[in-house]
């Protein structure tokens, strides 16, 4: 009797241990993909950011933005010191052997025209595709991220072909003891851009994961204040605005054939700001233009989280109950941004939808110096990481 009780207790303990292990594995299965921008090194003073400032256990994947494509259609560096920064980034893997690094090619400055020229021409496309794996391997990267912003209607099939051929090349390039290179793409979350440039069902099957840019939904073109990354539709949203939220974009992508298990929800560490046109300062108030540039980022209409912390001193803070995001006003300035509460709500949503995880744009726009709260580094990214656990 005594022996069977012990056996049962032992079995129960083993099962409990197994359950805990399975839980840990399922929790750790979430990806936290974080972008780093090479131009952040040029910001003044405490705004300057280099890859060695990244905490090696913060993200599961780090994406270096951006690489270039040379005149002979080969993957190439962009900045004068990219090679040195590639080395700094990939050295983080000596401290965290599970960390994966990817190189993103393209971006806003690169433009859609050059991508179109390469993807639409078989000879150019083949040259580019064949150049990628040797380049990534030589610098120690684990994969490529495509940031074609954004394919036009005529490019839709070329974009699919480019992704398909890159995936085939990565499969062909695998050798014993060497993992297949990862392939991801940064996709717009705007309905018009999705409908115009992406065959979602086709590209999703060839990508390891999709970085859905669920931000920049609202801008100065609307001529009124609005949050650029609302989780849900707002009560006052017009017919067009009903598409401009995280919830709609995620569900739409899944409806079009993207597997939830490959979809990463983009969470911004930056805020979008506006200059108010009158004393009215609530959601939907008229604006005269973009907000004032930040002290370090120096870009009208955009503020890093560490600049927002400074703005919040003496500001009036509001929380949008439907959209689940905050905004703040001070004088004639209006800023929609993320905080720890809003990012936790977003992680709760992505878990509910069984998404692959979260993507962060960008590490250098989070409070990496710990200026908001002393010795609290990367507060938004860490809040996302904690909520994913």
UniProtKB/Swiss-Prot annotation:
From the UniProt record, list the coiled-coil ranges: none
- Localisation per UniProt entry: Secreted, Extracellular space; Cytoplasm; Endoplasmic reticulum
* Organism of derivation: Mus musculus (Mouse)
Which CDD domains does this entry report, sorted A to Z?
Answer: GH18_chitolectin_chitotriosidase
Domain spans labelled GH18: 30-389
Cited InterPro entries = Chitinase_II/V-like_cat, Chitinase_insertion_sf, Glyco_hydro18_cat, Glycoside_hydrolase_SF, Glycosyl_Hydrlase_18
Its recorded name reads Chitinase-3-like protein 1
Q: Which residues form the signal peptide?
A: 1-29
Please give the tissue specificity annotation from the record for this chain. Detected in lung in pulmonary macrophages and alveolar type 2 cells and in bronchoalveolar lavage (BAL) fluids. Expressed in mammary tumor cells (at protein level). Expressed in lung. Not detected in non-inflammatory colon.
* Entry binding sites for chitin: 79-80, 106-109, 150, 213-216, 361
Consequences of knocking out this gene = Mice are viable, fertile and appear normal, but have defective antigen-induced Th2 inflammatory responses and defective IL-13-induced responses, displaying accelerated cell death responses and diminished M2 macrophage differentiation. Mutant mice are more sensitive to S.pneumoniae infection, displaying enhanced mortality, exacerbated lung injury and decreased bacterial clearance compared to wild-type mice. Mutant mice also have an exacerbated response to hyperoxia, displaying enhanced protein leak, tissue inflammation and chemokine production and premature death.
- The glycosylation sites are 68
UniProt keywords, alphabetically: Antimicrobial, Apoptosis, Cytoplasm, Disulfide bond, Endoplasmic reticulum, Glycoprotein, Inflammatory response, Secreted, Signal
Q: Which GO terms describe its biological process?
A: activation of NF-kappaB-inducing kinase activity; apoptotic process; carbohydrate metabolic process; cellular response to tumor necrosis factor; inflammatory response; lung development; positive regulation of angiogenesis; positive regulation of ERK1 and ERK2 cascade
* Listed transmembrane segments: none
* UniProt cross-references to SMART domains, sorted A to Z: Glyco_18
Q: What are the disulfide bonds?
A: 34-59, 309-372
Induction is noted as: Up-regulated in colon under several inflammatory conditions. Up-regulated upon pulmonary inflammation elicited by sensitization and challenge with the chitin-free aeroallergen ovalbumin or with chitin-containing antigen house dust mite (HDM) extract. Up-regulated in lungs after S.pneumoniae infection. Up-regulated in splenic cells of mammary tumor-bearing animals. Down-regulated by hyperoxia in lung.
Q: Name one GO cellular component term.
A: endoplasmic reticulum
Please give the superkingdom of this protein's source.
Answer: Eukaryota
Subunit notes for this chain?
A: Monomer.
Write out the GO MF terms: chitin binding
